[in-house]
Amino acid sequence: MTQTPEALTTEQFKQAIIDKGQYYHIYHPFHVMMYEGKATQQQIQAWVANRYYYQINIPLKDAAIMANCPNQRVRQEWIQRMIDQDGEYPDGGGREAWLRLAEAVGLSREQVISEELVLPGVRFAVDAYVNFARRASWREAASSSLTELFAPQIHQSRLESWPQHYPWIDDKGYEYFRSRLSQARRDVEHGLTITLDSFTTHEQQQRMLEILQFKLDILWSILDALTLAYVHNEAPYHSVTQERVWHKGLFK
């Protein structure tokens, strides 16, 4: 009879989660290019405009987690993530801070909000994340947020390198990165507690690690799409037209 593998201890499981950081998108060539000061203004703008679509969908992901969660105490803590991103009226929260970043790199907020620069590959990756959060159990969807473990490092790297390499970016644009340094650390504590308490068998733990890899795949795929379009100059339909003919704004 096949013996069921033993579950990891809490510390082993936590370390296995941390080890996934080697696949975080901070190591993607597109991000390395930006960090090293080798990106053009157009490439920076493209990243900001496309990442906006990710930013505005994070509250929808968090709303889906809360909608599936029967635990009031968890919802009371989780809702802070939505407030961070959407703000409390009339404050625009993280979304408004991202639009200030867009203006700081030379984009108009109208162009960014229109989503006309959002590549199909980016849209599909982000939509897959939101749909996962809607369909998965709230515990599984919550655990996917643990890429935040690695987020402070990526935000700090931008704050350290971008002002040096891209002096044309207005300093007011960096507020989003500054705010996320503390917010991400707080979010990690909550998400990690839920994850370590929820996945206690070998099978559950391995599934959770696959879920975390799924989230890492999403972040990596976003940069793959940007690389194809803005490094290799092979945007969708590049072989037949230079126009942005891909679909836009179907689901607003």
Curated annotation (Swiss-Prot):
Coiled-coil residue windows: none
InterPro entries linked: Haem_Oase-like_multi-hlx (IPR016084), PqqC (IPR011845), PqqC-like (IPR039068), Thiaminase-2/PQQC (IPR004305)
Pfam families linked: TENA_THI-4
UniProt keyword terms in alphabetical order: Oxidoreductase, PQQ biosynthesis
EC identifiers of the protein: 1.3.3.11
EC supergroup of this enzyme: oxidoreductase
Biological process (GO), any one: sulfur compound metabolic process
Physiological role: Ring cyclization and eight-electron oxidation of 3a-(2-amino-2-carboxyethyl)-4,5-dioxo-4,5,6,7,8,9-hexahydroquinoline-7,9-dicarboxylic-acid to PQQ.
NCBIfam families noted in UniProt: PQQ_syn_pqqC (TIGR02111)
Protein name: Pyrroloquinoline-quinone synthase
Gene that this sequence comes from: pqqC
